[in-house]
């Protein structure tokens, strides 16, 4: 199972790389604001025309992006408390340490795509043309919330409570990803890219976490 998760994660990351490279060469068209170009232009344009732009939904999903940030802070505080209590970083629970390392990897990926822009948003935000690939909100939600489920599953003993928490988090993930697409502030390819990258990283995190657990 540990190897399977790892290989699935690697496969998803390879798909993400292929998808990203394809965006540079397949059906590239200047369909964005200020003549900005994006790959899979025909597909992106069709889906963007269907969804339209809904700034109210953009605002809602933007503010709800604080939820995963609160989760990051919560687990960070938990790790800090354990570190202070045990007076040794390496005595902090393995799953908190691996989670912290995972968050660092996600942050590096985010910074990388902010520096090396693949494409821009289909609309201007406050008159500014912003980087859009991969969707940072999709990444944030899909990289933070699934590991949160894993954390809660290992800590919550009551199966009923555990099930409610899992369903609530999964519903939140679905709402955020779909909401971000329907809001029209990202191209369809941005959402796909964010989902592929996030899924790959989470599967590898899951594998590493299991390996650490059984050491």
What are these regions (language model features)?
Residues 54-62, 87, 91, 95, ...:
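Membrane-helix interfacial "entry" motifs
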Residues 1-71, 114-125:
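N-terminal transmembrane-helix/juxtamembrane module of multi-pass inner/ER membrane proteins
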Residues 31-33, 80-160, 164:
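Membrane-interface loops
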Residues 2-6, 54-61, 93-97, 158-166:
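Membrane-interface helix-boundary signature
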Residues 61-69, 97, 101, 136, ...:
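Alpha-helical transmembrane segments of integral membrane proteins
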Residues 47, 77, 109, 113, ...:
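Alpha-helical membrane-inserting segments
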Residues 3-8, 22-24, 126-215:
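Membrane-embedded catalytic cores of phosphoryl/pyrophosphoryl-handling enzymes
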Residues 15, 71-77, 101, 105-109, ...:
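Lipid-exposed faces of alpha-helical membrane segments in multi-pass integral membrane proteins
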């Amino acid at each position: 199972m540990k190897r399977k998760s790892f290989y699935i994660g690697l496969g998803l990351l390879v798909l993400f790389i292929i998808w990203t490279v394809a965006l540079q060469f397949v059906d590239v068209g200047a369909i964005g604001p200020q003549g900005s170009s994006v790959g899979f232009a025909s597909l992106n344009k069709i889906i963007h025309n269907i969804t339209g732009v809904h700034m109210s939904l953009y605002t809602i999903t933007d503010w709800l992006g604080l939820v995963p940030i609160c989760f990051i802070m919560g687990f960070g505080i938990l790790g800090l408390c354990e570190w202070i209590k045990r007076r040794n970083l390496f005595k902090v629970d393995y799953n908190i340490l691996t989670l912290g390392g995972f968050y660092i990897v996600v942050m590096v990926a985010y910074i990388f795509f902010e520096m090396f822009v693949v494409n821009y948003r289909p609309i201007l935000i406050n008159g500014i043309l912003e980087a859009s690939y991969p969707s940072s909100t999709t990444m944030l939600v899909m990289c933070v919330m699934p590991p949160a489920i894993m954390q809660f599953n290992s800590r919550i003993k009551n199966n009923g409570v555990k099930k409610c928490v899992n369903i609530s988090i999964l519903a939140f993930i679905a709402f955020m990803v779909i909401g971000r697409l329907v809001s029209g502030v990202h191209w369809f390819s941005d959402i796909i890219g964010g989902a592929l990258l996030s899924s790959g990283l989470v599967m590898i995190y899951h594998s590493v976490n299991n390996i650490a657990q059984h050491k």
